[in-house]
Amino acid sequence: MAIRKLAPVTPGSRFMSYPVFDEITKSKPEKSLLEPLTKSGGRNSAGRKTSRHRGGGHKRHYRIIDFKRNKDGIVATVAAIEYDPNRSARIALLHYIDGEKRYILAPKGLKVGDKVESGEKVEIKTGNTMPMKNIPLGTDIHNIEMKAGKGGQIVRSAGAFAVLAAREGDYVTLKLPSGEIRKVRVECRATIGVIGNADHENIDLGKAGRSRWLGIRPQTRGMAMNPVDHPMGGGEGKSKSGGGRKHPKSPWGQLAKGLKTRNRKKASQKLIVRGRNAK
C-alpha cells in the first residue's frame, strides 16, 4: 500500500495524506455479512460517559469477521479485498466451495483468486489457519487465539504480526508486536502471515475535521481546565505544579505517568515471560 500526499491548496490539505486504495477490488460490501452498528457516544447504559472524546462520526455498518476460522477441510477462494471502516486492516471476502461466504482479515500478499484453508494440518502458506502446535518455529502469524475455540483476539491491526519463538510441552512462546513475550496453549489457532495495509500508521489526518469523521472529539488538556474540573487545573500561567499538586494525574486523581495498574494476582500473569515495558 502506498500513501498519497495532497498538494497544499488549503490549510487542511497541507499535511494531509490518504492511502492509495489500489489493493481494494470491490467497493460495496457483501450484504449478508453486514450488521447494524449503533453509536454510543462513549456513554454506558445509564447515559454516563465512560469513554471521553467519543461522538459523532460517519455512519457505518459492522462487517461480520470470521476470527475463529473453524470451517476445517473446506477450501475457500478469495473473491475480493475490501475496505472496512471499523478497523485499520483490509478484509478479504472468501467464497467456500460449499457456497458459504465469510470475511477474514486480509494478510499481506493475499490476492483475488488465491486459495485458503483452515484445519489441523494444512499447508504453511499465507492466509491458512491451524493450531500453533503444527506451525514451524520462526513463522510470522496473526489473529491469534488466547483460548482454544474462542477466536483470534490479539495481533489483528494493520501491519501487525507475532513470531512463534518456541514450543515446549503444552505451550508455545510468542513474541508480540508490543515486545511482550508470552506463552499460549499449543491448541490455540493462528493465521499464517503479516496483516496487510502496513502504511496505515504513516497516514496524517491533516485537519481536525477528519478526526470528527472518525468519531473522535477534541481533547482538552488538564492544565487548561479549572481546579474543579481536573487535578492539574488552575494556577497562574503555566503552573507545572497543577494546583499545588506535585505529579501529573488523570482527571480522577490517579498518577498519569508510570503507575502500574495491572493486577499482579491475575491468573494469566504466569504466562507473561517478559513484559512489554521490560528493559
Swiss-Prot record:
Q: Where is the composition biased (Gly residues)?
A: 232-242
A single BP term in Gene Ontology: cytoplasmic translation
A GO cellular-component term linked to this record = large ribosomal subunit
- Compositionally biased region (Basic residues): 49-61, 259-268
InterPro entries for this protein: NA-bd_OB-fold, Rib_uL2_dom2, Ribosomal_uL2, Ribosomal_uL2_bac/org-type, Ribosomal_uL2_C, Ribosomal_uL2_dom3, Ribosomal_uL2_RNA-bd_dom, Translation_prot_SH3-like_sf
Region (Disordered): which ranges?
A: 31-61, 222-279
Signal sequence, start to end: none
| A GO term for molecular function | transferase activity
Keyword terms of this UniProt record: Ribonucleoprotein, Ribosomal protein, RNA-binding, rRNA-binding
SMART domains from the entry?
A: Ribosomal_L2, Ribosomal_L2_C
UniProt family annotation:
Belongs to the universal ribosomal protein uL2 family.
Function noted in UniProt: One of the primary rRNA binding proteins. Required for association of the 30S and 50S subunits to form the 70S ribosome, for tRNA binding and peptide bond formation. It has been suggested to have peptidyltransferase activity; this is somewhat controversial. Makes several contacts with the 16S rRNA in the 70S ribosome.
- Subunit info? Part of the 50S ribosomal subunit. Forms a bridge to the 30S subunit in the 70S ribosome.
Per its record, how is this protein called by name?
Large ribosomal subunit protein uL2
Q: Which organism is it from?
A: Chlorobium chlorochromatii (strain CaD3)
Top-down, what is the taxonomic lineage of the species of origin?
Answer: Bacteria, Pseudomonadati, Chlorobiota, Chlorobiia, Chlorobiales
Q: Which gene encodes it?
A: rplB
